[in-house]
Each structure stands twice: as C-alpha cells, then as structure tokens.
C-alpha cells in the first residue's frame, strides 16, 4: 500500500487500482488525501478495509464493491468505476445511501470494437490455430483443407446489443469489410441504419442468417444466459460466435456443446462466466475457439483515458455535478 499525504486533507480518496502518478497528483492538487492500493489482494485487504473507514470517495475496478465493503465506509460520498459496466457494484445499497456511482462510457468504444474485429478475423481465418500448428512443426509442404478458414469480407454480421460499442463495430464491419450489418436491439437506431445500411431484425432471423454473431450485451439478470442451447441451435453451422460484452450472457456448457457437435464453426471470447477462467475449463481443449483474458480495453492508451475519466468523474461528483457519467443520477436527485 502506498499512502500519499497532503496538507489539505479535507476529503479522503481511496484508489484501489494502479493509476498514473499524474492522476494521483491531480487529486492531491484538488486538496484530497489519497491512499492507493495496487491492486487489492489477500496481503492488503485488511489495510483496504481500514482505509475506507474514512474514505469519501473510491476509484477503481474489478474488485467487488458489495454491501459488505460499503458497510465499512460510513463517510462514502461517491464511487467512481474505471469501467463502463457496473455489475461489480451493489447499486441497491448505493441508491439507498444516495451515493453516486460514476462510470466511463464512450472512451473505450474503439478498443472494444477492435478486439471484436480481431476475434472475428482470428477465428474465421484460423490464425491462432495455424500459429499453433506451425510452432508444432506441422508445416511440411502444401497445405490441406484443415488449414483453411472462412472469409470475413462481404459476409453478414449480426450485432446483439446496439449501443455505443455496437455502433463502432458496425462501422468497421460495413466500411472496412463491406459486410451486411444487422442488429438486434429493443429500439431502432436510425443513425446506424442510415450510415451503415444496417437492418433492425428480430433475434431468430439474425441467428439463422448471420455468418458472425457479435454480442455486446450488458450483464444483468435479464441477460443471464441470453445465449444457451436454443439460441445456438438456430445458428448456421458455419457461424462464428463472438462475445466481448459480459461473460454471464453466455451459457458456456451450451457453447461447448455447439462447438463440439459442429452446430457452429467457431467462437471467440474475451469474457467468461467466471473470471479468471478455470484452468480445467473444457473451453481450453477446443481448437475452434480463441480465448482472450478480458483484454478488450487493455491498451495503454485506453486504460489511461479511462482512469483520467474516472478521476474527473469523482471530482465532479464530489463537487455536486452529476450531469455526466453518473449511473444512478435519477435516484440521487430524487
């Protein structure tokens, strides 16, 4: 644990993830006392609990901020997540205590769309599979069809969840790869339809006609196992399934079955039901899936921008400004 003191300690901020020193200094220059954990682990968890007893603000990600944690922070005025998703935060308790929860939308749209596009290409063209075989010394002459992949360009992509990330992904698919774009969403997005000739279709139509299914759904009880046996059975056997939204939206048992039985051709995952992925997961034994350790936003540039946004969000919230990036602003203002 690194404790950074300040002459004007009117408010105490606990940062529970490593952020750039310039951002720590920005908080200090605002008059805050800052305590930083890089990150929370079994060796410093008790120190963290002790620190939040006097905390007015929290900044971080990954670590679960549940009722137990919040009960140890009686003076808490704001929580600022270095993420877009907020399923690691007990929103019921935060709402009840009128504590604003800030997050960092928009800043990661491009990096998320890039990782999904990368997964589409890697799975379709068997890049990881071919790399593995080359390293095993299997390239001994002309290639047989087991090395061959599928085209990406001019195919149909079905985007499930047309939010900010979905819109940026649609742009890449349409403008970069001349793909036909369809999307499933509660409401229509006329801008996407106009710019990228995207079609708003029902779920069954998208599942049965798309070459690529790309999932960017948020995590909630409503979307838990949104994709299970029934959904995979409706897909083309040449379909490729990509998920970089939330792991809970996919029933991994059903996905494994679809991959093993040839119901779909392949898959690419950046998120999982349980993270880190269990070392004995059957997903690790399959050659027709590409697995990434939740790195959708893990670029140096995006991580810094997200951290900077989270710091700015916290400062704004502690100054009473909830107009931007506040998840529960409508509850707080009641």
From Swiss-Prot:
Broad class of the protein's primary localization: cytoplasm
Organism classification: Eukaryota, Amoebozoa, Evosea, Eumycetozoa, Dictyostelia
Enzyme category, top tier: oxidoreductase
GO biological process, one term: D-gluconate metabolic process
Family (UniProt): Belongs to the D-isomer specific 2-hydroxyacid dehydrogenase family.
Subcellular location: Cytoplasm
Catalyzed reactions: D-gluconate + NADP(+) = 2-dehydro-D-gluconate + NADPH + H(+)
UniProt binding sites for NAD(+): 164-165, 244-246, 270, 294-297
Function: Catalyzes the NADPH-dependent reduction of 2,5-diketo-D-gluconate (25DKG) to 5-keto-D-gluconate (5KDG), 2-keto-D-gluconate (2KDG) to D-gluconate, and 2-keto-L-gulonate (2KLG) to L-idonate (IA).
Keyword Oxidoreductase belongs to the record: yes
Enzyme Commission (EC) number: 1.1.1.215
CC terms in the record's Gene Ontology section: cytosol
Origin species: Dictyostelium discoideum (Social amoeba)
Domain of life, source organism: Eukaryota
Protein name: Probable 2-ketogluconate reductase
Alphabetic keyword roster: Cytoplasm, Gluconate utilization, NADP, Oxidoreductase
Catalytic residue positions: 246, 275, 294
Family annotation (Pfam families): 2-Hacid_dh, 2-Hacid_dh_C
GO molecular function: gluconate 2-dehydrogenase activity; glyoxylate reductase (NADPH) activity; hydroxypyruvate reductase [NAD(P)H] activity; NAD binding
């Amino acid at each position: 644990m690194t404790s950074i003191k300040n002459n004007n300690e009117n408010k105490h901020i606990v940062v529970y993830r490593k952020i750039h020193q310039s951002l720590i200094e920005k908080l200090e220059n605002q008059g805050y006392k800052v305590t930083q954990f890089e990150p929370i682990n079994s060796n410093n968890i008790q120190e963290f609990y002790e620190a939040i007893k006097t905390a007015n603000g929290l900044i971080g990600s990954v670590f679960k901020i549940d009722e137990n944690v919040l009960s140890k922070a009686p003076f808490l005025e704001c929580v600022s997540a270095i993420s877009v998703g907020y399923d690691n935060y007990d929103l019921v308790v935060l709402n009840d205590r009128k504590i604003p929860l800030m997050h960092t939308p928009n800043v990661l749209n491009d990096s998320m769309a890039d990782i999904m596009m990368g997964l589409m290409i890697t799975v379709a063209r068997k890049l990881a599979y071919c790399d593995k075989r080359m390293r095993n010394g299997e390239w001994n002459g002309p290639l047989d069809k087991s090395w061959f992949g599928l085209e990406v360009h001019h195919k149909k992509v079905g985007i499930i969840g047309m939010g900010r990330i979905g819109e940026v992904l649609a742009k890449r698919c349409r403008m970069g790869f001349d793909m036909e774009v369809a999307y499933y969403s509660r409401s229509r997005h006329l801008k996407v339809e106009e710019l990228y000739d995207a079609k708003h279709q029902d779920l069954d139509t998208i599942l049965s006609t798309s070459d690529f299914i790309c999932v960017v759904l948020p995590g909630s009880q409503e979307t838990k196992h949104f994709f299970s046996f029934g959904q995979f059975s409706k897909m083309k056997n040449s379909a490729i399934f990509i998920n970089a939204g939330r792991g809970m939206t996919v029933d991994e048992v059903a996905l494994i079955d679809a991959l093993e039985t040839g119901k779909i051709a392949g898959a690419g995952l950046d998120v999982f039901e349980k993270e880190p992925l269990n070392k004995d997961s059957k997903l690790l034994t399959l050659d027709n899936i590409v697995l990434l350790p939740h790195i959708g936003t893990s670029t140096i540039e995006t991580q810094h921008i997200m951290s900077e946004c989270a710091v700015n969000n916290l400062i704004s919230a502690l100054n009473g400004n909830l107009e931007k990036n506040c998840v529960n602003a409508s509850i707080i203002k009641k």
